């Protein structure tokens, strides 16, 4: 087929069709530079050359009753990770100060839970109020499934975003988790939206999806209107059901980059984040990825290490990207 129309305003008005998306995902190697430049143009049209730095904090590690196949903290996991109860208020504030020193613009508080308990809501509510009083950080919570009133409590405490990833396509979800459904995740995002929280929701690629499922994920997130969209690439962790790496065998740097391009083109106004696994899978294309996304995670993920801060800084400085600063509104 002919090249699709990749004009940024047009992409904001009308999503790519499945046929156009497959053109991107199945493009030959010689088309990759032009597709990458198109994605970069989209990012710069809507956001300029800004890059937002995001820091994660795992406020409670392990002991999660859910059975997500990718997760080292789940009930099915035998992974050798640190497991600890809910951090104290003082520990959370120390890590917020560290995030500020690293030039982070957003601080994400994550807990391995089916959903937040009253204790978790109280502790993180206190933490949010204290952080907002001291640091110009955007705050995001990722605490599992939300019941009635929980999102409102988080919003009142000062959280700006709620993270709850769709992770994969609806048709594949029963392979990934059985203790909750894809629809449960959609309900949680709906509750967060109705409470006035901005939505952070993304995917984990490399869990057995094909090109059509990648399109399905990207389109679903567009239809949800998520403000923040992390694209993760599976890090197989020994001791988890997906720990043998069989599902990522074909995830080459070219395929990883083309997937990121598609998420950019289908979600031109979303804050796209190159998340877990970028260091491993993007390889020589990581500089291109930095130019087409809005944000990156700093210094690692929930249970896995990431890039040293100095390495990432050298990369964004070499590309002339402007790191976001300033008080959050």
Curated annotation (Swiss-Prot):
<feature type="domain" description="Radical SAM core">
    <location>
        <begin position="46"/>
        <end position="275"/>
    </location>
</feature>
<comment type="function">
    <text>Catalyzes the conversion of dethiobiotin (DTB) to biotin by the insertion of a sulfur atom into dethiobiotin via a radical-based mechanism.</text>
</comment>
<keyword id="KW-0408">Iron</keyword>
<dbReference type="GO" id="GO:0051539">
    <property type="term" value="F:4 iron, 4 sulfur cluster binding"/>
</dbReference>
<dbReference type="GO" id="GO:0051537">
    <property type="term" value="F:2 iron, 2 sulfur cluster binding"/>
</dbReference>
<keyword id="KW-0808">Transferase</keyword>
<comment type="similarity">
    <text>Belongs to the radical SAM superfamily. Biotin synthase family.</text>
</comment>
<keyword id="KW-0411">Iron-sulfur</keyword>
<feature type="binding site">
    <location>
        <position position="273"/>
    </location>
    <ligand>
        <name>[2Fe-2S] cluster</name>
    </ligand>
</feature>
<keyword id="KW-0004">4Fe-4S</keyword>
<keyword id="KW-0001">2Fe-2S</keyword>
<dbReference type="InterPro" id="IPR006638">
    <property type="entry name" value="Elp3/MiaA/NifB-like_rSAM"/>
</dbReference>
<feature type="binding site">
    <location>
        <position position="64"/>
    </location>
    <ligand>
        <name>[4Fe-4S] cluster</name>
    </ligand>
</feature>
<keyword id="KW-0949">S-adenosyl-L-methionine</keyword>
<dbReference type="GO" id="GO:0005506">
    <property type="term" value="F:iron ion binding"/>
</dbReference>
<keyword id="KW-0479">Metal-binding</keyword>
<dbReference type="InterPro" id="IPR010722">
    <property type="entry name" value="BATS_dom"/>
</dbReference>
<dbReference type="Pfam" id="PF06968">
    <property type="entry name" value="BATS"/>
</dbReference>
<dbReference type="InterPro" id="IPR007197">
    <property type="entry name" value="rSAM"/>
</dbReference>
<dbReference type="GO" id="GO:0009102">
    <property type="term" value="P:biotin biosynthetic process"/>
</dbReference>
<feature type="binding site">
    <location>
        <position position="200"/>
    </location>
    <ligand>
        <name>[2Fe-2S] cluster</name>
    </ligand>
</feature>
<feature type="binding site">
    <location>
        <position position="140"/>
    </location>
    <ligand>
        <name>[2Fe-2S] cluster</name>
    </ligand>
</feature>
<comment type="pathway">
    <text>Cofactor biosynthesis; biotin biosynthesis; biotin from 7,8-diaminononanoate: step 2/2.</text>
</comment>
<dbReference type="GO" id="GO:0004076">
    <property type="term" value="F:biotin synthase activity"/>
</dbReference>
<dbReference type="InterPro" id="IPR024177">
    <property type="entry name" value="Biotin_synthase"/>
</dbReference>
<feature type="binding site">
    <location>
        <position position="68"/>
    </location>
    <ligand>
        <name>[4Fe-4S] cluster</name>
    </ligand>
</feature>
<protein>
    <recommendedName>
        <fullName>Biotin synthase</fullName>
        <ecNumber>2.8.1.6</ecNumber>
    </recommendedName>
</protein>
<keyword id="KW-0093">Biotin biosynthesis</keyword>
<dbReference type="InterPro" id="IPR013785">
    <property type="entry name" value="Aldolase_TIM"/>
</dbReference>
<comment type="subunit">
    <text>Homodimer.</text>
</comment>
<dbReference type="InterPro" id="IPR002684">
    <property type="entry name" value="Biotin_synth/BioAB"/>
</dbReference>
<feature type="binding site">
    <location>
        <position position="108"/>
    </location>
    <ligand>
        <name>[2Fe-2S] cluster</name>
    </ligand>
</feature>
<feature type="binding site">
    <location>
        <position position="71"/>
    </location>
    <ligand>
        <name>[4Fe-4S] cluster</name>
    </ligand>
</feature>
<dbReference type="Pfam" id="PF04055">
    <property type="entry name" value="Radical_SAM"/>
</dbReference>
